[in-house]
Amino acid sequence: MILYEDPIENETTIAYISTKTPIIPSICDVLVTRGTPSFDETGLKHNSVVKLNKIATIKTHFIAGLLGTADEVLQAEVNKALDACLKFAPQE
């Protein structure tokens, strides 16, 4: 999942997506499952988990293609989980 694109450095920050969904997700996991409104837009074919404790920055040219998009609901879930997982300080 693309978290951030830096056009100046030509780099993209991504989070790992796996089809091995945990029985009990951690605070760093965001489940993307069939039957939820967000699932269809993602282009994923199976229930999946976005692992926000597995983040990498890669050169954009290594990205072969995109499957779909994250709707506003999924983006909000990812942002909330990122805050919890990385323990960002609350904004004042």
Q: At which residue positions do the language-model features occur?
A:
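Conserved functional hotspots at enzyme active or ligand-binding sites that engage polyanionic ligands
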Residues: I2-E92
